[in-house]
Amino acid sequence: MNKSIFIQLQDQIDKEHSIREKLTAEVDLLDEKLRVLQLLLANCEQNLENQEEILEALEIIKSKTRGLAELASNFPYYKYNGVWDRSIQKVVYLYLLASWTGRLDKSLRPTYSLLSLSEVGQILQVPVFPEESTFHLSIEQYLHAVLSLCSELARQSVNSVISGNYHIPFEALNTIQKVHSSFQVLSLKNDSLRRHFDGLKYDLKRSEDVVYDLRIHKLV
């Protein structure tokens, strides 16, 4: 048997491993910044004093995302997109949350409303519907991010009641209801996305319960 065949295969394996290592290093740097922003946004309705920190973190994440996009665009998208897929979902989710809570430019979207996929791409300066298979924000990443936002809004509904911000649960419920009804028109082919959507009914119920309790106790 000609061993050169396996030597060539090993060379290709080493090459692909090197590419994955480079991409993973960029993703790790991005993830580190995402953790910082997530902490800043965790109770953003109760703490409006960290606006400058949030804006700075958003800009850093934007820069890191564009850096990853530039690097990743040198390689076949569908071969390596699994390296950054979850991290980019989180980028989109945190930008949706920042916008919903009024931490982004309100000329893009008013507070308590949802950025579109195209708007997120415009903010990050990353392609959304590319003609070629290069780095971009995918529809699936956006939909996962929207569902994650709903889970966070349901969680923050409870926290906002504790802190006396009684209007937040109503805004959150309005958004979750709209997302729930909008997802009904989609024919989801992605198994992961279908499972994620299945959990939305629990977020909706949780949010409805908070609003019901507020009304029953005449707090609004």
From Swiss-Prot:
<keyword id="KW-0963">Cytoplasm</keyword>
<keyword id="KW-0238">DNA-binding</keyword>
<keyword id="KW-0694">RNA-binding</keyword>
<dbReference type="GO" id="GO:0043047">
    <property type="term" value="F:single-stranded telomeric DNA binding"/>
</dbReference>
<dbReference type="GO" id="GO:0006396">
    <property type="term" value="P:RNA processing"/>
</dbReference>
<dbReference type="GO" id="GO:0035939">
    <property type="term" value="F:microsatellite binding"/>
</dbReference>
<comment type="function">
    <text>DNA-binding protein that specifically recognizes consensus sequences at the breakpoint junctions in chromosomal translocations. Selectively binds single-stranded d(GT)n and d(GTT)n microsatellite repeats. Has much higher affinities for the homologous RNA sequences (GU)n and (GUU)n. Does not bind double-stranded DNA. Has a role in meiosis.</text>
</comment>
<dbReference type="GO" id="GO:0005829">
    <property type="term" value="C:cytosol"/>
</dbReference>
<dbReference type="GO" id="GO:1990605">
    <property type="term" value="F:GU repeat RNA binding"/>
</dbReference>
<protein>
    <recommendedName>
        <fullName>Translin-1</fullName>
    </recommendedName>
</protein>
<dbReference type="InterPro" id="IPR036081">
    <property type="entry name" value="Translin_sf"/>
</dbReference>
<dbReference type="GO" id="GO:0005634">
    <property type="term" value="C:nucleus"/>
</dbReference>
<dbReference type="Pfam" id="PF01997">
    <property type="entry name" value="Translin"/>
</dbReference>
<dbReference type="GO" id="GO:0051321">
    <property type="term" value="P:meiotic cell cycle"/>
</dbReference>
<comment type="similarity">
    <text>Belongs to the translin family.</text>
</comment>
<comment type="subunit">
    <text>Forms an octameric ring-shaped structure, which is capable of binding DNA or RNA.</text>
</comment>
<dbReference type="InterPro" id="IPR016068">
    <property type="entry name" value="Translin_N"/>
</dbReference>
<keyword id="KW-0539">Nucleus</keyword>
<keyword id="KW-0469">Meiosis</keyword>
<dbReference type="InterPro" id="IPR016069">
    <property type="entry name" value="Translin_C"/>
</dbReference>
<dbReference type="InterPro" id="IPR002848">
    <property type="entry name" value="Translin_fam"/>
</dbReference>
<dbReference type="GO" id="GO:0005737">
    <property type="term" value="C:cytoplasm"/>
</dbReference>
<dbReference type="InterPro" id="IPR033956">
    <property type="entry name" value="Translin"/>
</dbReference>
